Each structure stands twice: as C-alpha cells, then as structure tokens.
Amino acid sequence: MDCQKLFSVIDTLSEEYFAILEDVCNLESPTADKAGVDKVGAYFVEMARKRGWKVESLPLETAGDPICITLNPEANARPVTFSGHIDTVHPVGLFGYPPARREGDKLYGPGALDCKGGVVASFLAMDALERCGFTARPVQLIIQTDEETGSKTSGKKTVDYMCSMAKDAVAFLNTEGSDGNKITVARKGILRYQFHIRGKATHSSRCEKGVNAIVEAAHKILKLEELKDPEGLTCNCGVIRGGTVANTVAEECSFLADIRFANQEQCEQAQALVQELAEHSYLPGCTCRLEKVSDRPAMPLEDRNLALLETINGIYAQVGLDALIGKKERGGSDTAYTTRAGIPCLDGFGVDGDGIHSVREYALLSSLVTSAKRQAAVAWGI
C-alpha cells in the first residue's frame, strides 16, 4: 500500500472530520455526567457500525461505558492500538451555547484539545486505512470515559478494560494533546489526599483556650509545599476549607494535596511523608484524619517505549514525516497503566492547541490532519 495515497485520502477527508470534531465538542461530557459521556460514545459507535467495524464496550453504572472499536478484527497479526478519552472537566453550560465554535484554524470547545480531537484523528486514520485497502493487522481505537478523575469514577474498571483489550498491541498510541514534534515517553504519577483536621472551638476573645484547626492545617501545608523538585516530588495544596465565623476559633479544617512523583520509590517516599504529617500534630489537641482521594501510577522511562519511538521514527523517515523527539511530562495519563501492563506505548499523538482545562481551550484543525497521518503511518509501517 502506498503511504502517500493514504496521506492524500486523509487530506481529502479532513473537512468532514473537522465537522465531526465540532459535533462531539457540542456534546458536553463532564466525567460525572454518565449520560453525556455515553452520548459522545454513541456518536463514535454509530460511525463505526456504519463502516462495519467491530464494536465492543463495557457497561458501567457510574462512569461512561468504555468502548473498543476494531478495524480488521480477523487479521492474523498483533494490533496497533489508538486510545483517547472523551470525558471533560467543566460543568455543562460553562462554554455557552453552542459550546463549540470555529475561528479560522481554531476550534474552541470542551475537550477539543483534551482529548476529543485526538480520538477524532484516530478515527480519521482508521477510515483512511480502510479506504486504501489496509488489511495487514487489526487497528483498535479504545475510547476512555473517566480519565479526568484518574478513573476513580469507575473504580479503575475503565483502565482495566483498556489494558485487557490492548494487551497484545505491538504499539499503543495515546492521543493526549500534541506538542509539535515532541512525544511523551515518561509521565509523573499522582497522589491526592484530603486532610481532615479537628481542633477545639472557643470564642475568639479566649483563643488561648481553643485549638485552631486552620493553624494546624497551615503548618502541614507549608511542609508539603516544600516539595518543589521538577524531576522529583512536587505538591500543590490547591483547595482548603475551614472555620465558620471570624469570632470563633476554627474547630475544623480540611485541605486537598496533589502530589506528583516520577517513580515508585518517590511514590513510597510521598506516602510515608503524608502519613507522618497526618500522625504528627503541630498544635497539642489537634487530630487529623487522612483520606486518599485518588491515585495514578507514574509512566517511568522504559526501554521498550524508547524502542517503539525509534521504530516509529524509522517509519516516518520512509514516508516523509518529521521525526518525533521524546520528552518527559509532569501531568498524568492512561499510558501509566499500559506501561505498567508491559504494553509498548507512547503518548501525545493527539492534536495541537492551547487553553487545556479552561473555557479558552482550542484545537488547531490543521494538526488533526497531522495527528491522523502520524497514527496511520504507524499502523501501515510497523
């Protein structure tokens, strides 16, 4: 099969897929809105079934149903797997109506960059592969539904499903937002803890008789905020609630700590520090209850992932695509789980844009074409 013909088909189909991305961005799908997430999933399922592709899904009660769409399911070779998530972070209505809008090469809307654009690019790549007669191996598209909560919404059922469906993949390409020709080979993991602190209330005029839970929280926060190593542990305490009125010593205070780590050793170090902080009181009479809110493993630098990058760059050299440069990211993603499962994977094959997790989020439509070509070339050449 001629890869240049494949690229030409992608170019020809591009306007159709720009409209598809606008459609799915107009379907708002915050993670907790199962009906909204499933509506986006149903959009892709309908497209796949019209083409005669195999469709599988995992019915869930609390999260959107994750989906696996397969082109050439009967082919006798290891699959190439594309993956991306369709859940977003903002409440319905925050973007106004309609949520999506086009301005030149920019498409604004919830999830345009993170990560609906990447999923649409994967579908475009598969569509073009089929139109060009590609039958050499299965090509999967796994659609994730609760990535934005670290898969807490489903109790990790979605990532277990993803790893199970992709277990035989020769390459797993995750379609989080792109950064030019840089591709993600390692990511930090995430630990989130809620600290619930209880002191002793009293009238503020007799504050020496009370124990201020907010002050205890402040001591703990300052200790956690010492973690600021870009290559190691970092912590952000971004949410705090405490007290009732100005003339009462605060009896209760809670705060949320978001800790990032690069490897398992750092993860264990962070867990030990958090436990020690919870057990130690800076103010006599204060107690602390620790709640683990969510977690996601790190995607450490692995030889098999670097080897996959080298293989892909060899393919790109043959077909005239720019080489990719590996980079480390501090944010988490689902490739942490596929890496832990031993599946060769890389991240950042989605679209370019800016404003992630804000009402200014946009995708560059021209980058959707680039993303589709990069993904299709891997399936064609690996």
Model region roles, listed by residue range:
Residues M1-K5, T12, S29, E56-P59, ...:
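Metal-dependent amide/peptide-bond hydrolase catalytic core
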Residues P79-T81, L107, V170-N174, R192-Q194, ...:
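Short glycine-aspartate micro-motif
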Residues S83-G84, I142-Q144, F172-E176, H196-R198, ...:
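Short beta-strand segments
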Residues H90, K106-V120, H203:
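Glycine/serine-rich anion-binding loops at beta->alpha junctions
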Residues K116-K188:
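Acidic/histidine-rich catalytic neighborhood of metal-dependent amide-processing enzymes
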